[in-house]
Amino acid sequence: MKKLKLHGFNNLTKSLSFCIYDICYAKTAEERDGYIAYIDELYNANRLTEILSETCSIIGANILNIARQDYEPQGASVTILVSEEPMDPKLIDQTEHPGPLPETVVAHLDKSHICVHTYPESHPEGGLCTFRADIEVSTCGVISPLKALNYLIHQLESDIVTIDYRVRGFTRDVNGMKHFIDHEINSIQNFMSEDMKSLYDMVDVNVYQENIFHTKMLLKEFDLKHYMFHTKPEDLTETERQEITAALWKEMREIYYGRNMPAV
């Protein structure tokens, strides 16, 4: 897309929001309580603040204020207010390509608000536990929150991811013409690294004329030992392993498709 010469500030709002799910099987009530306590501590308010602060660096945001809270019995939330520094538009990369990975983050930039809320969950029957993190990165101006996508998904354990990106409002060029988007985008997937795309089955549902983009991701590889909490698959009977695998896959598909499915 050709560089736009704007009249005044870029008034477009770009919002990236996604849910990240981690699924686990805990055989006993004690194991379920243990998983909830483990995941709640792993993603406490302090750890989430570190992740979001690095996100600010990636998208180019100056932190104005941080509000964080751990909840009882579980869960946490962090909200960061951010602002944008004056930046030379020539230095802003608007091309459609993946953002940095955690180990390659060296950028410094800035913007609007970033927030995350966590929801650990379990049920006394069935042994299934889920952890959900809701994240929203919203910016105003030339910087795209999509640059933080790679980093955030790599930082959180992700069996299932649902992502929404939308551009709202308009900005004017020097001739007074309105522009409702200032960068090219065909798919959110174009902002993901190849190694990430190789790990997931993905589907897009996009409404191009409304500047709304949606991608769903489901982890391809399934290894039962990665889903067990304090129980080894080899300590179970073959029938138990098959039943647990079926229950986990059903849970993951229901979350991925957003509807309950009949038992097979």
Curated annotation (Swiss-Prot):
Give the highest taxon in the source lineage: Bacteria
What are the alphabetically sorted keywords of the record? Autocatalytic cleavage, Decarboxylase, Lyase, Polyamine biosynthesis, Pyruvate, S-adenosyl-L-methionine, Schiff base, Spermidine biosynthesis, Zymogen
Q: Which GO terms describe its cellular component?
A: cytosol
Its recorded name reads S-adenosylmethionine decarboxylase proenzyme
Q: How is it modified after translation?
A: Is synthesized initially as an inactive proenzyme. Formation of the active enzyme involves a self-maturation process in which the active site pyruvoyl group is generated from an internal serine residue via an autocatalytic post-translational modification. Two non-identical subunits are generated from the proenzyme in this reaction, and the pyruvate is formed at the N-terminus of the alpha chain, which is derived from the carboxyl end of the proenzyme.
Q: What does this protein do?
A: Catalyzes the decarboxylation of S-adenosylmethionine to S-adenosylmethioninamine (dcAdoMet), the propylamine donor required for the synthesis of the polyamines spermine and spermidine from the diamine putrescine.
| GO BP terms | spermidine biosynthetic process
As given in the record, the signal peptide range reads: none
Q: In which pathway does it act?
A: Amine and polyamine biosynthesis; S-adenosylmethioninamine biosynthesis; S-adenosylmethioninamine from S-adenosyl-L-methionine: step 1/1
Q: Which organism is it from?
A: Salmonella arizonae (strain ATCC BAA-731 / CDC346-86 / RSK2980)
- List of catalytic residues: 112 (schiff-base intermediate with substrate), 117 (proton acceptor), 140 (proton donor)
- Gene3D superfamilies given for it? S-adenosylmethionine decarboxylase
Q: What terms describe the molecular function in GO for this protein? A: adenosylmethionine decarboxylase activity
Against Pfam families, the record matches this protein to:
AdoMet_dc
What the record notes about the co-factor is: Binds 1 pyruvoyl group covalently per subunit.
Q: What is its EC number?
A: 4.1.1.50
Q: Which residues carry this modification: Pyruvic acid (Ser)?
A: 112
